[in-house]
UniProtKB/Swiss-Prot annotation:
Keyword Signal (UniProt): yes
Keyword Signal carried by entry: yes
The protein's name in its UniProt record: Ustilagic acid biosynthesis cluster protein orf3
Cleaved signal peptide residues: 1-38
Induction cue: Expression is strongly induced under conditions of nitrogen starvation. Expression is positively regulated by the cluster-specific transcription factor rua1 that recognizes and binds to the specific 5'-T/G-G/T-C-G-C-A-T-A/T-C/T-C/T-G/A-3' upstream activating sequence found in all promoters of the UA biosynthesis genes.
Origin superkingdom: Eukaryota
Keywords assigned: Signal
Function: Part of the gene cluster that mediates the biosynthesis of the glycolipid biosurfactant ustilagic acid (UA). UA is a secreted cellobiose glycolipid that is toxic for many microorganisms and confers biocontrol activity to U.maydis. UA consists of 15,16-dihydroxypalmitic or 2,15,16-trihydroxypalmitic acid, which is O-glycosidically linked to cellobiose at its terminal hydroxyl group. In addition, the cellobiose moiety is acetylated and acylated with a short-chain hydroxy fatty acid.
Pathway recorded for this protein: Secondary metabolite biosynthesis
Chain intervals for the UniProt region annotation (Disordered): 42-62
Amino acid sequence: MTYSKIACSLGKRGIARAPNQASSFFLLLFLFAKFSQQLSPSPCLASSGVAKSRGPASTDRPCSASMAEAVLDLLADCSPTASVPVAANAPSCAGVAASAGAQGASPSSQVSPQA
């Protein structure tokens, strides 16, 4: 099981949900990665699956990327505010509201007057 899978599953189960617990959890994870890097100077992330889980952009990385980078990637993956790619042709919220108003589907036109 990779570091990202372990940390994400712990975060989803509520072990690392509270702010203080989450920061201490990731600090311990970072320190563990730092010390394991000192014990083994070039860990191969490709064999553990950490680099593969990030998609095609991560395959450009060399196999000897540091564990600290893996932890930082893990933090980016597991954060609730991680950016989600949006399709370039997806309509914006303002555009959808404007088109709904132009078609007479605005909330004010749908309200029937009370007698």
